[in-house]
Design a protein with these regions (language model features):
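Catalytic cores of large soluble enzymes that bind and process phosphate-bearing ligands
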Residues: 38, 55, 59-63, 85, ...
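Hydrophobic/aromatic beta-strand patches that form the interior of the parallel beta-sheet core
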Residues: 4, 22-24, 82-84, 109-111
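Glycine-rich phosphate- or other oxyanion-binding loops that anchor nucleotides, phosphorylated ligands
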Residues: 53-55, 61-89, 95-96
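Short coil/turn connectors at secondary-structure junctions
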Residues: 1, 19, 76-80, 105-107
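Short, ordered loop/turn segments at secondary-structure junctions
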Residues: 8-9, 86, 113-116
């Protein structure tokens, strides 16, 4: 089983690699610049920019197409995919993941964590450890 999450989980690239998790970045716009969260903007840098610019960021979810691409690639080695995302009450990420899940030839289960940041990250970590221990989605 493969795991997909978004950068709203606040897991680092290194943590995702260690856990075998695919992370899709949220897009963050501050002023005239757009960043890929977790790729070219770390959580620490994000908070520093908030402090120094005094601006509120605009964010956007990974696109349905980005989810389709990720699911399709992962399904080449394992058709079972667990897609764990930040709260649907705060972001459209879970919805984009659900739409994409219907477009791929894979068994994708989308989990709306109803939280964000480390709350989502902990759920991703727990799922990764459970999969390594041989547990199924149930």
């Amino acid at each position: 089983m493969k795991i997909v999450t978004d950068s709203g989980s606040d897991l680092t690239k290194e943590q995702c690699q260690e856990l075998g998790v695919t992370m899709l970045p949220l897009k963050v716009q501050l002023g005239e610049r757009t960043y890929l969260s977790g790729v070219d903007l770390s959580a620490e840098e994000f908070y520093e920019l908030l402090d120094t610019t005094g601006q509120m960021p605009l964010t956007s979810t990974p696109s349905v197409g980005e989810f389709v691409d990720a699911y399709t690639k992962l399904a080449e080695s394992d058709r079972e995919i667990l897609s764990i995302h930040i709260s649907s009450g705060l972001s459209g990420t879970s919805n984009a993941a659900r739409v994409a899940a219907k477009q791929v030839d894979a068994d994708v289960t989308v989990v709306d964590t109803l939280t964000l940041s480390s709350g989502t990250g902990w759920q991703v970590e727990a799922a990764a450890h459970a999969i390594k221990a041989g547990w199924g989605k149930e």
